[in-house]
Amino acid sequence: MFSRFLKFIIPPFTFRVFFRRIFYSNLKKVPLEKPLLFAGNHQNSFMDGVLVGSYLPQPIHYLMRADMFKNSVARFFLQELNVSPVYRFEEGLENVHKNIETFKGIYSILKQNGNYVVFSEGICVQQKRLQKLRKGTARMAFGAAEEYGLDVHIVPVGINYTYPAKFRKEVLINFHEPFSIRELQELYKISPAKALLAFNQRVEAGLQEQVIIVKNPENDWLVEQLLIMGRNNYVLPFFKWRFDSDNRRLLEKEIAEKINLIDKTSKTALDTLTSKVRTYFELLAKNRLKDETIARKLDWGTIRYLSVILGFPVFVVGYLSNLIPYVVPRLICNLFIKDLRFYSSVYIGIGTVLYLFYFPLVLLIAGLIGGWIWFFIGLLIPLTGYLVLFYQEVVIERFQTFCFWLMKLKNPKRISEIEHFRLEILNALEEIKLDTTSNQQ
């Protein structure tokens, strides 16, 4: 019951506020009428599972490491959220046998054509790299097939964040082609060890296709700057927040793969490109400019400047009326959450619960003090708070555009130099050709 209520609240409201955009693509590939195991990469604690399952038509179930269930209050809420404990060797060998009960519960759900989100890496790491897959997911799938004859389908899911611990950023979720556990059952009868290995190879291959991977950590900075430039080449609808297209992920995947390629084949080309990118962003910083402004060459935008002026009263009202639920989660997370893997999950959890108490309380106070008129005015508080987010974006964008045009009037040669550097970088990136006939992973 609690999980259904949160599914009604979090995807359409909480996610709309926390994420600037969500790209949720290729769900049509998933056979929703089958028992399903969604096998995703793991970057962002509890957030990953919630994102994968939020837009599925049926209830979603999760696995979480058992040490999160030690507290009785936490255990109650996790169970209400359809979360099952999984005991790892890290929790002690004496506890691993408890997974038998967990697996029985999982099989019971799968028998009803239910589903589970699992993270085969077994560890949450905020890197653009996959970790070695563990065998728990494979054992779960083979167990369901062996004991109950279930045609479990495994769906690799790529989860890619622009910045996983930051507010108003983006996340890209893409579903890979599923495979049936029955495809590996004959091998399992002959050699369970080989079947487990083959299972992980299938999942890993799917994840490698869906996840944006930077193989060499030394290239993280370079890839990130190129991703910023790639994103800024495209203007998306301003108010739209959910997209079904996979084009954005493919763009970012291609950029990362090109750097992976020249890291392996041409260190000279890599060093040259890195030097150009570094010079370009140093020029931007020195002149207090942003790549977005250079890329889009925005005009003066009289209407947007007018919206900044006319929208200011709405901004003040919306900001002040939503200040507590906006500031408190951030303050708590900044003070107490030192591990960034948990930052956004805690932020969203606190923010959602707080607003569920805050908003009715404000309506009650407004109604008692000002009657029905103020009560109905109070109903606009969430909308004004949402508009504040866009107002802030417009103000920042207008300020950056103003600085750009001011610089262009004062020093057109400098702007031309910066634009030339950007074009050189994009041309150099374009010249790197991937072999589309083979897997570059």
Feature annotation, model-predicted:
Residues 2-8, 30-94, 325, 329-338:
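Catalytic core of membrane glycerolipid acyltransferases/transacylases, capturing the structured
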Residues 20, 42, 96-100:
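A conditional alpha-helix N-cap/helix-loop micro-motif detector
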Residues 2, 95-298, 376, 380-441:
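Non-catalytic C-terminal accessory region of glycerolipid acyltransferases
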Residues 13-34, 428-440:
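A short, well-structured juxtamembrane/interface segment
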Residues 20, 54-60, 103, 132:
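Basic/hydrophobic alpha-helical interface regions
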Residues 303-327, 342-393:
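Alpha-helical bilayer-embedded segments of polytopic membrane proteins, i.e.
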Residues 21, 214, 331-340, 368-372, ...:
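Membrane-interface elements of multi-pass transporters and channels
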Residues 292, 296-297, 327-345:
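Flexible internal linker/loop segments at domain or repeat junctions
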